[in-house]
Amino acid sequence: MGARIAASLALTWPEKVATLILGGLGYGMIDGVGDWDPIAAALTADDPATVEHSRGKMFRAFADQTRSDRRALAACIETSRALISEDDVAAITAPTLIGVGTRDDIAGSGQRLAALMPDAEAFDIEGRDHMLSVGDRSWKAKVLAFLEDHPIS
């Protein structure tokens, strides 16, 4: 959700975005990432044992494990489904780093998204799924190196 928000910011106020980092969302920003209604329902279910949707169970378990605000996450899911067009993505001129886990079946291709942008690079977060990719040490190291290479002046 943060990657979608960051991309929207870069499109709406490009003059305010010196560098852009999109973690956990690739081409899915353009072609969608599936049906999120069962995930929102899983996050707001009173009893996690009643959740039957496999992806919903995964998101619910992760939210509970990290003690996240499940209602806030569900609200974000319900309001952040707007897709961004290829033309819009191509208009993002800020240096951009895109990170997607190699086991992420939600995000879509980081490489494919980066190829649309004039100054973007993709980073494969090896062995990580959607839930674990942005917390990965290799991703964090890549982000720090990217920011060092693209200092905000």
Language model features with spans:
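Flexible "cap/lid" loop of the alpha/beta hydrolase fold
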Residues: 4-47
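Hydrophobic, aromatic-rich cap/lid helix
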Residues: 60-85
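Short, conserved loop/helix-junction motifs that constitute active-site signature segments
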Residues: 89-93, 115-117
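Short beta-strand/loop motif that positions the catalytic acidic residue
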Residues: 92, 98-100
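Acidic beta-to-alpha connecting loop that harbors the catalytic carboxylate
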Residues: 101-104, 127-129
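Conserved alpha/beta-hydrolase "acid-adjacent" motif
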Residues: 104-110
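Catalytic active-site module of serine/aspartate enzymes centered on a nucleophile-bearing elbow/loop
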Residues: 123-153
